[in-house]
Amino acid sequence: NGRPERNFEKLHSAKKLMSLPDEEITLTETLKQHGYATVDFGKAHLRKDPKSYGFDEAITGWVRSYYYPFSKQYEKTLPAKKGDYYTDKLTDAALDFIERNKDRPFFVHLEHFAVHDPIQGRKDLVEKYQKKLIRMPKQKGPEYILEPNPDGPAISKDELKKLEEKDSLEIHQEKRVWWMKQKQDNVEFAGMLE
């Protein structure tokens, strides 16, 4: 990864793998054994079809634009039209998956691309943050790409509340929501703990 080894530091360069070894048992494979429906939406560095890691459904890959058309690979898997925003469409797909699997346990792995190139915020959010961006010369636009819904990242609190209030879903007592950050530091600081 380009980082020189230094005896006085606790971080050392990690061996890079091109994909997860087949003998590794994944969380999704374990969940499927226990009757869970599993889905992977968004950014994934798996190098192989996510279904080979235990996902029932997957909509993954790179985007050329956050506005429709996103890229050719999404034409069949993520229906969209002119003006649609990629982050919102992935969130809609996740909500649809939850609705379709409301009568069984499910696992949704949703990773938005929003903080990766190309940096293209939703137009209404770009306008909202224009004044603040003037004071941010080193980072042009991180806040408007991290706010895909009015209340925050991924599925908003309002959407979760709507899901809880729908008696037909009956998932509110069994739901677990994990917010996780992808650890992807700048290359100059990459490595792993001893």
State where each predicted segment sits:
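Residue-level "edge-of-site" marker
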Residues: 44-45, 63
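Short, glycine/acidic-rich beta->alpha junctions
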Residues: 19-23, 40-41, 89-90
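Active-site segment of extracytoplasmic enzymes that catalyze sulfate/phosphate-ester chemistry
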Residues: 1-26, 30-36, 50-53, 57-72
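Active-site environment of divalent metal-dependent phosphoester hydrolases
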Residues: 46-49, 117
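Active-site-proximal cap/lid insertion segments
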Residues: 3-4, 58, 62-194
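Short Gly/charged-rich anion-binding patches and loops
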Residues: 26, 45, 93
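Residue-level detector of functional hotspots within protein domains
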Residues: 41-44, 178-179
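Outer-envelope exported proteins of Gram-negative bacteria
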Residues: 39-42, 49, 107-111
